[in-house]
């Protein structure tokens, strides 16, 4: 296979270091994952270069965050496929990688009934937009 050079960016993330730092505070405050994440872990997540995987506590809350980031063009609209294709996140119960279908269902649910903790995400998204 041909060696591809340059930086791959499947999420097409426009997030800067200070914005990722803010998002790190957000996901930790919202207890999004089963572990506390560092700025480096979140940076690696958005670069699809995680040394391991994250395990989600609440898939709907994750979907809500990613949906918001996508709405404001911080990441691509196809974020669900990026998570599935790169096997970045495991389901809490079965410990299997989240699929696009799981994320699509969670996104639909989050649009109808805001998930517990959504106000934490809204607060940080507002801060992101202020710069």
Kindly give the residue locations of the regions a language model identified.
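Flexible coil/loop and intrinsically disordered linker positions at secondary-structure junctions
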Residues: 1-131
């Amino acid at each position: 296979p041909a060696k591809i050079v340059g930086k791959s960016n499947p999420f097409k993330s426009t997030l800067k270091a200070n914005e990722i730092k803010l998002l790190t505070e957000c996901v930790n405050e919202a207890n999004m994952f089963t572990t506390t994440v560092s700025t480096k872990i979140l940076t690696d997540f958005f670069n699809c270069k995680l040394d391991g995987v994250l395990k989600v506590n609440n898939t709907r809350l994750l979907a809500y965050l990613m949906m918001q980031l996508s709405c404001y063009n911080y990441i691509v609209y196809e974020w669900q496929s990026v998570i599935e294709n790169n096997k970045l996140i495991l389901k809490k119960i079965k410990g299997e990688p989240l699929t696009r279908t799981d994320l699509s269902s969670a996104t639909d649910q989050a649009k109808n009934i805001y998930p517990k903790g959504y106000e934490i995400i809204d607060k940080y998204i507002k801060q992101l937009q202020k710069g």
